[in-house]
A protein has these predicted regions:
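Beta-strand-loop-alpha "switch" segments that mediate conformational coupling across diverse proteins
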Residues: 120-161
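Conserved C-terminal guanine-recognition region of P-loop GTPase G domains, centered on the G4
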Residues: 92-110
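Inter-motif core of Ras-like GTPase G domains
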Residues: 50, 66-86
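P-loop/Walker-type NTP enzyme "switch/lid" segment
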Residues: 1-56, 61-62
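Hydrophobic "anchor" residues on beta-strands that sit immediately upstream
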Residues: 54, 72, 114
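Structural beta-sheet core signal
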Residues: 57, 80, 115-117
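Catalytic P-loop NTPase motifs of RecA-like helicase/translocase cores
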Residues: 6-9, 62-64, 88, 102, ...
């Protein structure tokens, strides 16, 4: 599900469909406009009650976007990408605080965090930075699961069909 207004993941999937015409792709991407909170809540409740499997949802990065509360409240897991740089860590901390307040207001909310470092390159980082990154991950473990670092060069991964 692509809930983000820019619909980047949906657009990328449309390109894939054209590029791999006639090939059965292993998953679909559907766009969804989240402006109407009631529509979001109804859609996710129906999905949660009637679908067996995994649904990945891309959401806007702006926490003031209408429709985000039911997405987070009805999710089992919240995958939170971050980078080892000050602005990203600060934004991640703000997001953790937002979700904590939401969980306090909605005790039925049982979402769990999975933190995934984005654009990590094992070739970079001085000793002090590496220690800081380790401490950052240790701190994040207080709030959820920290996925192992996966080296990447950024952008989208290429999948061969």
């Amino acid at each position: 599900m692509d809930f983000d207004r820019q619909q980047t993941i949906f657009s990328k999937r449309q390109e894939d469909i054209g590029k791999y015409e006639g090939v059965r792709l292993p998953y679909t991407v559907q766009p969804f406009d989240i402006k109407n909170t009631n529509n979001v809540r109804e859609f996710l409740t129906n999905l949660r009650n009637g679908y067996k499997g995994f649904v990945l949802m891309d959401t806007p990065g702006n926490l003031s976007q209408q429709g985000l509360v039911p997405i987070f409240a009805l999710s089992h897991y919240i995958v939170c990408p971050y980078q080892f740089e000050a602005t990203s860590i600060s934004s991640t901390a703000t997001f953790i605080g937002f979700i904590a307040k939401l969980q306090h207001m909605l005790p039925v909310m049982k979402s769990r965090f999975i933190f995934v470092v984005n654009k990590w390159d094992k070739r970079y980082g001085r000793k002090a930075e590496l220690e800081l990154w380790d401490k950052t991950e240790e701190r994040l473990r207080h709030f959820g699961l920290v996925a192992p670092r996966i080296e990447g060069q950024g952008g989208y991964a290429t999948v061969q069909y």
